[in-house]
Amino acid sequence: CFSMSRFITRFADVVKIPEPNLAPVNLNDLVFSCKRFMEGMCTDRNIAITLDIDEELGGVNLDIALFEQVLVNIIKNAAESIGKDGKIQIRTSSPASIEIVDNGEGITKETEVKLFSPFFSTKPNGQGIGLVFIREVLMRHGCSFSLRTYADGLTRFRIIFN
């Protein structure tokens, strides 16, 4: 009963995502701070987390608090899909985009179509709200995005700022 109550409260928080408070943000600074925040979790799992940044990339208007949550959630999902002993690379490029690449388990085509659905999770104790939150924030920022495992076995979460 307690976990259902907690779940409903958390899901209601997702539904109540505030309108983005947009301000100019340097994407390279943003990904650097999110990488630093997640380094402890990755080190504990022997996961190398690296940056490949486009030094020429300018700023974009976004809600930094919401976007930090988005990127941390994506990196956390990548680390969880790896488990132990893997790699996560965070890239920025022009035109303004961020790509998080990991060598974790990967996503099947069947799973890919369900990923952003409420209550769907591939995790044993997952509640299916993390990617819903990410989708909502990205849509409110006018971003296009994709999450897919490619033939090379790497999974890429790509965010393009339109």
Named regions from a protein language model:
Residues 107-119:
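Short conserved segment of the HATPase_c
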Residues 142-148:
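Glycine-rich ATP-binding loops of the HATPase_c
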Residues 23, 43, 48-58, 93-95:
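Conserved catalytic submotifs in the C-terminal HATPase_c
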Residues 134, 138-139:
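Detector for a conserved hydrophobic position within an alpha-helical segment of the HATPase_c
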Residues 17-20, 59-62, 122:
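Conserved micro-motifs of the catalytic ATP-binding
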Residues 21-35:
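A conserved beta-strand-to-alpha-helix junction within the catalytic ATP-binding
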Residues 85-97:
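Short beta-strand/loop element within the Bergerat-fold HATPase_c
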Residues 102:
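Acidic ATP/Mg2+-coordinating residue in the GHKL
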